[in-house]
């Protein structure tokens, strides 16, 4: 488990983040990692979450949790700077987040998915990325307030989950920074 219990609690406790309660530089956005099987991918996502200032990470199902040498190798210490919490049942975590007022934005390729750049991202929210092969669990898709996808133009129909996470995380950061005054901009 995380060596900093106060940061774990910060990721899971209390109302959805707001500009008034977030530490400086943090976004009113979380991410839920649903059954990510590679600890290296999880470590990379911790590092990216730190870089963009996500409010915290929720690790669900079989997703690797710190401390683990393979996770820490790619996280480069970000497990100590990004608040996180582990939920054995990612769908239960999503229900709790929605009950606390967070919109659930799922990154997945479905017929109903909206192009990620055209989507109107709500704040505060939690975005969800899923298993490297099977994607986001159906139980999470049914809870989604919005499903977005990154269009693919090559022969391969998907990106590595940590790459997709990074693209979406920076997109979330840009959208937050472009909000008009009074709606959360800088």
What are these regions (language model features)?
Residues 1-186:
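Post-transcriptional modification and biogenesis factors for structured RNAs
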């Amino acid at each position: 488990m995380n060596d900093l219990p106060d940061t774990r609690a910060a990721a899971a406790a209390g109302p959805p983040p707001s500009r008034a309660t977030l530490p400086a530089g943090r976004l009113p956005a979380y991410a839920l990692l649903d059954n990510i099987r590679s600890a290296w991918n999880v470590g990379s996502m911790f590092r990216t979450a730190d870089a963009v200032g996500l409010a915290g990470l929720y690790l669900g199902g079989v997703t690797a949790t710190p401390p683990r040498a393979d996770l820490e190798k790619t996280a480069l210490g970000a497990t100590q700077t990004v608040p996180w919490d582990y939920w054995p049942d990612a769908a239960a975590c999503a229900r709790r987040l929605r009950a606390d007022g967070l919109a659930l934005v799922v990154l997945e390729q479905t017929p109903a998915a909206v192009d990620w750049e055209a989507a109107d991202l709500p704040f505060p929210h939690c975005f969800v990325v899923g298993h490297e092969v099977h994607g986001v669990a159906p139980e999470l898709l049914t809870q989604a307030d919005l499903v977005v996808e990154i269009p693919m133009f090559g022969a391969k129909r998907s990106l590595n989950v940590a790459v997709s996470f990074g693209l979406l995380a920076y997109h979330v950061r840009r959208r937050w920074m472009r909000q008009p005054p009074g709606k959360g901009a800088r």
